């Protein structure tokens, strides 16, 4: 597993990213973090990929249907990667320049995880694109057994009948863990209590803000 050579954003703000399987518990963590940070900071919560990609035919085909023969997965990966790059420069970076704290629900790491989990481990183009992607101040990866994640997804009324490729979920979990380790991320097991998980997130965020604030002034 190669490390992504992302660019430092060099702004007054802070970028924190949250990645993991659907049902890993990241939404609970980032929602609570946003609420706490807003007491003292300007906070902007965003999501990748954007709705422009999420509502596209190719994205919905891969998310909701077992038959993927209509598309080459690379085409979706390229679409998602370009969307993340554009979103970073047009949405995230201006917020960081203002000194805001940006929390991103998923980030470029998810693009890499999905590409590799589908068998494209030797595709180097994604590493080239990563050079233009801003490096987070802290990247959180939330790990949970696949069965637990799927059970959580199925408990949502709108997704109880959603198609889920179980084999893919196992591969994705492995990729997320590898990407986290290769890129200096923070790995948190959401099998632990919500309180323990959140305390780990908050502790790291507070450490980063404290250590970097003077350097950014």
Q: Model-derived features: where do they sit?
A:
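ATP-binding Walker
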Residues: 23-24
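NTP-dependent small-molecule kinase module
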Residues: 2-9, 32-34, 147-217
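Post-Walker A helix-loop "phosphate-sensing" segment adjacent to the P-loop in P-loop NTPases
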Residues: 35-44
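Hydrophobic anchor at the beta1->P-loop junction of P-loop NTPases
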Residues: 18
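Walker A/P-loop
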Residues: 27
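ATP-dependent small-molecule kinase phosphotransfer cores
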Residues: 44-131
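Pre-Walker A (Motif I) flank of P-loop NTPase domains
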Residues: 11-15
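A glycine- and Lys/Arg-enriched "phosphate-lid" helix/loop adjacent to the NTP-binding pocket
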Residues: 111-174
């Amino acid at each position: 597993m190669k490390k992504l050579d992302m660019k430092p954003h060099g702004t007054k703000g802070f970028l924190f990213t949250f990645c993991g399987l659907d049902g890993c518990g990241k939404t609970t963590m980032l929602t609570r973090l946003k609420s706490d940070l807003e007491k003292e900071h300007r906070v902007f919560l965003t999501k990748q990929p954007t709705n422009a990609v999420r509502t596209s035919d190719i994205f919905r085909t891969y998310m909701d249907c077992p038959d993927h023969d209509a598309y080459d997965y690379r085409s979706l990966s390229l679409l998602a990667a370009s969307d993340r790059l554009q979103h970073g420069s047009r949405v995230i970076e201006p917020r960081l320049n203002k000194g805001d704290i940006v929390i991103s629900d998923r980030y470029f790491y998810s693009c890499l995880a999905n590409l590799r989990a589908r068998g494209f481990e030797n595709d180097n183009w994604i590493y080239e694109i990563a050079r233009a992607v801003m490096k987070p101040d802290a990247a959180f990866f939330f790990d949970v057994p696949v069965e637990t994640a799927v059970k959580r997804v199925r408990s949502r009324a709108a997704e109880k009948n959603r198609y889920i490729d179980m084999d893919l979920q196992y591969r994705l979990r492995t990729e997320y863990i590898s990407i986290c380790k290769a890129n200096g991320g923070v790995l948190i097991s959401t099998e632990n209590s919500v309180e323990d998980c959140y305390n780990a997130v908050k502790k790291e965020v507070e450490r980063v803000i404290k250590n970097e604030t003077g350097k950014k002034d």
